[in-house]
Amino acid sequence: MNKNNVTIGMGQLLVEGGEPDRNLQRACEMAKEASRKGCDILLLPECLDLTWTHPSARMEAQPIPGPFSDKLCQFAKDYNIYICGGLTEKCNDKVYNAAILINNYGEIILKYRKINVLVCAQEFYSIGNSLSVVNTPFGIIGVNICSDNYIDSLEIGHTLARMGAQLILSPSSWTVDYSLTETEDPYGEKWLKPYSILSGLYDLVIISVTSVGYIVGGPYEGKKMVGCSMAVDKNGVIVKGVYNELTGNLVIAEINVVPRDAKGTDIGKMLNRKGYYSHEI
């Protein structure tokens, strides 16, 4: 039986470029805090080991399973919590921007490789080629990463929803210009619009957690990550993280996972009833 009311820890983690030991230690502390506060799942950022587009990805990326993922698995087991987070994955001669979902026994139950990789990041990461979902005590969970949720790549979210996802977890590294201040809206409709479309059409919850800190090295050097992570359902924003440039923090989201009866071709009929006709796009 699935648990409909789920407590998600949104771990806005301070991530330093090329410093996996320090970053993973912070992830450990975040897992400990999330467990203490009663979270069922802890969601961590994209590329939490090395930072997104950091040049160290070429030489320091590790396989999955491997030393970095093993540490996250141990944290999940030690603190009896599900953990989803992004890692830089080495596989043969390729590097991927990957994410894993780990159960509370420390087992990897889903691995995903980012598909909608920005052009500037393609010198570091190869393109992923598959999507999957997994059944958990908290409903069916799908995983994607950051720009997979751009409005022009929403097919990725649609596919996860059609595969049954009731909850989409999206490790992210949302970057903004260094000059942006706390008084400004960092993202506008960039993320809220696609999240609202998906959650409204499928009655699912989508949650993205971004890192905080300044990017050092790579094509985005000098930009910063400022938090403001979001959890969104069909009614709008459930909770939003605080603006933060230098210090990580844990945000708690209480969500309701809604059963969905429509499957297969019935989903198309459901979407049509809601005024969404994919053939008109």
Segments (PLM) and residue ranges:
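Active-site catalytic loop in hydrolytic enzyme cores
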Residues: 64, 90-172, 176-193, 245, ...
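CN hydrolase (nitrilase-like) catalytic-core segments centered on the catalytic cysteine
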Residues: 64-84, 150-249
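Extreme N-terminal starter segment of soluble prokaryotic enzymes
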Residues: 3-10
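Short polar catalytic/cofactor-binding loops
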Residues: 12-17
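Cys-nucleophile CN-hydrolase/nitrilase-fold catalytic domain and related Cys-dependent amidase chemistry
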Residues: 20, 24-111, 174-205
